[in-house]
Design a protein with these regions (language model features):
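S-adenosyl-L-methionine-dependent methyltransferase catalytic module, highlighting the catalytic core
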Residues: 61-156
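Conserved SAM-binding loop
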Residues: 3-89
Length: 156
């Protein structure tokens, strides 16, 4: 049985071949659920690929760790998380009044145990930043890809 490809916060522009999850009941949305309400209505390790285009900057900062931990829970081992986002503090970030959570190229080191100086602060579920990421896609738009890594003894 194949695993799900999930588009979180898909809105009306769901990626082709993906299951769309959004908090609004609109065309293209398959699962209506708020990304800040945990747990998501999905089984553990049910997704092989999760994409989020311009969604993480809308997650309230106090939900950030739990949000990434929940994506980790539903991600299958070796699955890929692809996120596109405006750089925190940039024009693209500040132009939308609903943007509340800024990310930059080093933010994701807090989720990867290979960067222990940052990872030990919050000890989230361990992700692995894929080689060559994050990358700049436009003037102030970035993309990061991470894979699910096994839980270690220091992860809570």
């Amino acid at each position: 049985m194949s695993k799900m490809k999930l588009d979180i916060g898909c809105g009306t522009k769901k990626f082709e071949g993906f299951t769309g999850l959004d908090k609004m009941r609109i065309p293209g949305v398959d699962i209506v659920h708020d990304l800040e309400v945990f747990p998501y209505p999905l089984d553990d390790e049910s997704c092989e690929f999760i994409v989020g285009s311009h969604i993480i900057e809308h997650i309230k900062p106090w939900f950030t760790i739990e949000f990434f931990n929940e994506l980790w829970r539903i991600m299958d081992w070796g699955g890929v998380l692809r996120l596109m986002y405006p750089e925190g503090g940039s024009f693209s970030f500040w132009q939308d009044p609903t943007h509340c959570n800024g990310f930059n190229a080093t933010t994701f080191q807090y989720f990867d145990p290979e960067y222990p100086i940052y990872y030990v602060i919050y000890k989230p579920r361990p992700w692995k930043i894929m080689p060559g990421y994050p990358v700049q896609r436009a003037t102030d738009i970035y993309e990061v890809r991470m894979t699910k890594e096994k839980k270690n003894a220091t992860t809570t």
